[in-house]
């Protein structure tokens, strides 16, 4: 096994990983940085993000407003000190991206244009047409090329991290092009591996978003926090799950049922102004959890449209006009034509909620470090405490760069101060990783990874979807336990050493099953409804701050069982309150403004 010596290793070369690498290189120009990715960096899932990235940019906006929208959107499960750090650093990172070449969309006067996104009361989403993730990732990638100390290991699949006496010491990866193993030694490792959306059958995620980093951290005793909170995006294409960005609704797109009725006005998102008034375009911009839940209720009422790929509602953009659609949403027009045969200029787009984002992830502190010294996590694979029970659209792209920078700087500092590990123990661990790989390759049985993965996805849709019941969650838990046993009998039929996807998909499935069990067990134990976790059973349909204003921590014990613990939520300035949107929120804002004015005059 070849060994590469580095100071810092970063797993994942998407937005978070690249930003961490750049920050590390700037923090210590002499540091040797290994950047490992199972795909070429520009194929990372960040490229699929369409809508935009949040940052205060207007005079009538403020850090306080961004903070409030994020905490309320997360149903008060956010770490408020983390949110405060985030909102104050977003504008700096957006400006930095512009200086590096990110082509933010502009107003006629040359200023940066911003959209309104769901759950945000003010336009603060920076965007580059509807290809924001692509442009951000391209900008970060080309910037990273300026730093020769960043050595890329493209198309390398990380098998496991190496830990000695509570401190990370590197990792073992497989060169997918050759089938050989490489040991990368480093006194700090940053996990930037993305979420776990592929544990669901229908999702908006790329094929690489399989929960690898979460699974590796979990196997070393690091808990996964708040895994019951999985966001369904309201507007995915039926069948494929391809995302119709929230930017569509930010530009004024509307959602209608089979009767052409804008049904969101029936679910607490109706505007204060009558239908048809200009302000009414924001009715569709409620938080994603509530908009997805409204679809479920429309389906129960029989107001959705049946198709061979499932029930849908319509996303209508026709009133925006051809010019605006081709200027602001060109990629959406391409996708709709290619995947559902619809020209958005002429007809509405069929959409349905689709699993989209993992709010939970690897537990970290406010500096992105886990319980293992030197092991950091950032981006969707992590739970730094930003999103709570429901993420607001456009906060995730901003999270990648704000906390990517922080993780890179903190990891560089940790690597510089770490002492030497036990060489014999580290080598023994690396040999153990190699042996487990051989055992998997030689495993005999009649099971197929693809069938198990398919059954896992369907089980998660059924038991851990938009609305949940104890019966369906228990059914999912039982099914996952069965699949874990069957996984032990998976047979690798491909014996090649070059791009053995049969082997790689099997390894991904192993991580996915472990992560899915954390999701299901965490959901069953949270006997309330909060954010993206909604229950239908009696006594659990409302938020319960007395018993469940706390984080769920899921551990995987040595015998393979999932064990749950809980930790407190850090509340600094904004105590829990009712979440209100639409006209109710407008009325509350007016009352607050009047109260402030009265106090000022009194």
Indicate residue ranges for each PLM-predicted region.
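Core beta-strand elements of the Rossmann-like FAD/NAD(P) dinucleotide-binding domain
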Residues: 3-6, 178-188, 371-374
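Glycine- and aromatic-enriched mobile tails/lids
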Residues: 4-6, 15, 23, 29-35, ...
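Conserved N-terminal glycine-rich FAD pyrophosphate-binding loop of Rossmann-like flavoproteins
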Residues: 39-69, 75, 231, 245-246
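An anion/pyrophosphate-binding glycine-rich loop and adjacent beta-alpha core
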Residues: 41, 216, 222-342, 410, ...
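A short alpha-helix-loop-beta-strand transition element characteristic
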Residues: 77-83, 94-110, 223-226, 304-308, ...
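Short beta-strand to alpha-helix junction loop
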Residues: 78-91, 125-142, 153, 203-211, ...
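Conserved redox-cofactor binding core of oxidoreductases
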Residues: 93, 98-180, 185, 192, ...
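Glycine-rich loop(s) and the adjacent beta-strand/alpha-helix scaffold that form part
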Residues: 188-242, 307, 387, 393-410
